[in-house]
Amino acid sequence: MSTVLITGSSTGIGRRTAETLAVAGHTVYATMRDPGNRDAGAVSDLKALARLRGWKLRVVELDVTSQASAEAAVRHVLDETDGLDAVVHNAGHLYIGYVEAFTDNDVSHLLDVNTIGAHRVNRAALPHMRSRRSGTLLYVGSTIQVTTPPFLGPYVASKAAFDALAVVTSYEVSQFGIETSIVMPGAITQGTNHFPGAGHASDLRVAVQYAELDPLVERTHEAHEQLFAPGTTADPQSVADEIERILALPVGSKPFRSVVDAAEAGVDHVMAFSDLTREAFVRRLGFAETLKVKP
């Protein structure tokens, strides 16, 4: 079994993934930004479950907007274990609103959490993984980078950048025996605080000038809910199960990309073609070896 660090484990996909991996017998480090205050309830619940069920699950503070915090969390794992086998990049935040009404600070903050946060954690974890010449970086992306719905502009941009960073990082770390998997969930409307807890554009002076579109924005959650066929649920557990399946696969057999989308938007077909095109171009450049994990 593996030792796995998960970012953003207080709710939703991160929480379900922590529990699912613990049930499977992995040693899980469920990290969250503010375990002493905002996330205290989640900490208490996870610790109680771990005691009751005998899970090897620990809660560790990790604020992905801080390099020092990322490095401290990884050190904590390495001090207690024989090594870190996998990182699940899950931390992220949704913003809803009119693109023009997002200030540069709004957009910078969203990129800082959703995109640069994963890079910080990689910088903390990769020296160890490279020295062992093994490990898995698993990124929880989103189909939204393909479907690009209205009123989610900066969030869409942050997830597209997150995916691109995962891809280009994979070329380099593959030569040190490190695998990459990108799991792309569709809209998750149940079992998470994603939509209810969404942030909003802060420039109200601009936002009011778009007031005629407010009824559409207010339907964003409902609009995503109606995508699913009767009896179909868009629940974080389906994503957690796929993450558990991927991490259990033998070295060298993990899929580079997996789409988990109850809305069946066709993103799996789009990304299959996109990845084939990308890989063909990398081969034309003469860098084919970066597409395979080096033993």
PLM-predicted stretches and their roles:
Residues S10-T11:
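Conserved glycine-rich cofactor-binding loop
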Residues A24-A42:
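Conserved glycine-rich Rossmann-like NAD(P)H-binding loop of the short-chain dehydrogenase/reductase
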Residues N37, E61-A72, D104:
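The beta1-alpha1 cofactor-binding region of Rossmann-like NAD(H)/NADP(H)-dependent oxidoreductases
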Residues R53-K56, H76-H89, Y95:
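A glycine-rich helix->loop->beta "capping" turn
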Residues Y98-V99, D106-S108:
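Substrate-binding pocket helix/loop in short-chain dehydrogenase/reductase
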Residues N122, S158-A161:
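Active-site helix of classical SDR
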Residues Q175-S253:
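SDR active-site lid
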